[in-house]
Amino acid sequence: MDLTQGFRARSGVVGPVAGLESLNFSDEFRHLVTTMPPETTGGSFTALLEMPVTQAMELLHFPDSSSSQARTVTSGDISPTTLHPFGALTFPSNSLLLDRAARFSVIATEQNGNFSGETANSLPSNPGANLDRVKAEPAETDSMVENQNQSYSSGKRKEREKKVKSSTKKNKSSVESDKLPYVHVRARRGQATDNHSLAERARREKINARMKLLQELVPGCDKIQGTALVLDEIINHVQTLQRQVEMLSMRLAAVNPRIDFNLDSILASENGSLMDGSFNAESYHQLQQWPFDGYHQPEWGREEDHHQANFSMGSATLHPNQVKMEL
């Protein structure tokens, strides 16, 4: 293989600057071929030029991995015998020379056609895919950690909300207990247990007890139901008692007018002992009006009183006459 033809073709494509670089590189390359021992020059450089760019760079920078790369290349069209002695070579450490060799190794890829295109497309794509996978895995792990943190924080937040709600309920219950103390009363259905309703209930119970006492005093009042009817019956009974007392007082006064019965004080004391103090004022006022009611008595009452008065006067006149006769 003539190296100058490949370099001329490459220089024709690249330009005058690339042509000069190719001429200089060809001179240096010939110098290397002439200086190297004859046992190692059998087709190894031609194989290097026919290799892809990435493999040539790896072989030039990492000579220890030449055996593994030679095995991968043997799977293609190149024979394994051409690359085996190339693994023991030592290349110069000039970076410019290595870059030029890697650049001009594209000639072999253009000559090989599909094989070089497949290798060139497959090799750079794999590292990118691996990098994408490596980048994606930490993102997934980060997302999982974030989800776990969010779930943990949400659980803590719910626990805090529950604690706050329980504390607020306790505070409300304590405030209510301070405001309204608990009343140990077993209330029936429809009955309240607050202080006002309890006071009203006690007042009604007292009134009912007094009404029962009045019903016991008034005859025939036990059979009557209803507060209004009971009160009417009590009023009628009291009025009848007043009339009876008036009649008795008038008869006593007609029989012996000298006897001064202090009926007002007697009746007031008796009524006070029998009835509640709330009726004392009314009864005393009514008793004060009883003497005046005698003037408004019916005619039959006045006639009876007149006969009684005449009888008393006749007895009084007879008594002194009898005394005179005895004398």
Curated annotation (Swiss-Prot):
This is Transcription factor bHLH48. The keyword Protein biosynthesis does not apply. Pfam families: HLH. SUPFAM superfamilies: HLH, helix-loop-helix DNA-binding domain (SSF47459). Homodimer. InterPro entries: bHLH_dom, bHLH_ZIP_TF, HLH_DNA-bd_sf. Its main location: nucleus. PANTHER family: STEROL REGULATORY ELEMENT-BINDING PROTEIN, TRANSCRIPTION FACTOR BHLH48-RELATED. Residues 191-241 form the bHLH domain. Expressed in leaves, stems, and flowers. Keywords: DNA-binding, Nucleus, Transcription, Transcription regulation. It is found in: Nucleus. One of its GO terms (cellular component) is nucleus. It comes from Arabidopsis thaliana. Signal peptide: none annotated. Residues 137-179 are annotated as: Disordered.
